[in-house]
């Protein structure tokens, strides 16, 4: 359903995966895990295809710019390098991706949500605080707030935090504290902690952690949230 594309916007070269619905719809930026967009352990392209089936124009930017990992050690190095050394480029890729989606002829209305998983969940929180005027809703999945500053006081868009009870990477209490700060802004905030599951429970390519029942429920809630705020 989708395809890889490359474009240049505002002097920034971007590559990524786009999936479009038959009749058009609002946009969703889908942010990859620490594996990278092209990793065999990533299901981000499949998630974009599923969003398209639900009536969204989904675009997954490649924030690693062609690099990817197939083991935790290399994935950790890529993620750490991105957050420590490349955030200016990450910001530029994100802004270019938002412009790309809003200019896409399939995107109608011209609203854009953002979701992501693992380090992509972190970026979904980060972008909601850094660029609240560029997006209309955010759904971070098990993001790691400890690896970059999340400007919770500046989050002004509806946001839905999805967490795993037994997540060994994420301090759920820290994410809930962020949610409380956002709530004080008068923003619609939701938090869902899925019991009995761990990090990456939505990734069907990770048989060691995938939970089909809770993954489907989280997916349904995500689609409903975006339909509420993007359509």
Curated annotation (Swiss-Prot):
Q: Which GO terms describe its molecular function?
A: hydrolase activity
- SUPFAM superfamilies associated with the record: alpha/beta-Hydrolases
One Pfam match, given by its short name, reads DLH
Protein origin, superkingdom: Bacteria
InterPro entries per UniProt: AB_hydrolase_fold, Dienelactn_hydro, Dienelactone_hydrolase-like
Q: What is this protein called?
A: Protein usf
Protein source organism: Aquifex pyrophilus
Gene, per the UniProt record = usf
